Amino acid sequence: MAALTNEQIIEAIGEKTILELSELIKAMEEKFGVTAAAPVAVVAGGAAGGGAAEEEKTEFTVTLKGLSDPGKKIGVIKEVRNVIPGLGLKEAKELVEGAPKVLKEDVSKEEAAKIKEAITAAGGEVEIA
């Protein structure tokens, strides 16, 4: 087998859809026993700030949990395509049918609320974390 250059690998990855990339990442995690999740820093609270409220979260993850009404699947697929530009019909259908799936990560509270409202109105169940 001929060795691929980094440039060839990057080019091949660039041609894949979002859904295909997600599957590739899962396969790599399983094969190499690693996770693609970013490390989480643990911050110890100071003694003087014992009563201080936790900082308000600024980035959210929007997850499609499923369908509230299976008869509205087509509407949810259309909204998923609006949320994820460039997502093909087949990939959007697979994403909806494979729920729960992450729709968007690291979005603002306002954007997360807009996505939830649109998907919920179309017949989907959404979780913001």
From Swiss-Prot:
Organism superkingdom: Bacteria
Gene Ontology CC terms, in alphabetical order: cytosolic large ribosomal subunit
GO terms, molecular function: mRNA binding; structural constituent of ribosome
Protein known as: Large ribosomal subunit protein bL12
PANTHER family linked to this entry: 39S RIBOSOMAL PROTEIN L12, LARGE RIBOSOMAL SUBUNIT PROTEIN BL12M
UniProt keyword annotations, A-Z: Ribonucleoprotein, Ribosomal protein
Assembly: Homodimer. Part of the ribosomal stalk of the 50S ribosomal subunit. Forms a multimeric L10(L12)X complex, where L10 forms an elongated spine to which 2 to 4 L12 dimers bind in a sequential fashion. Binds GTP-bound translation factors.
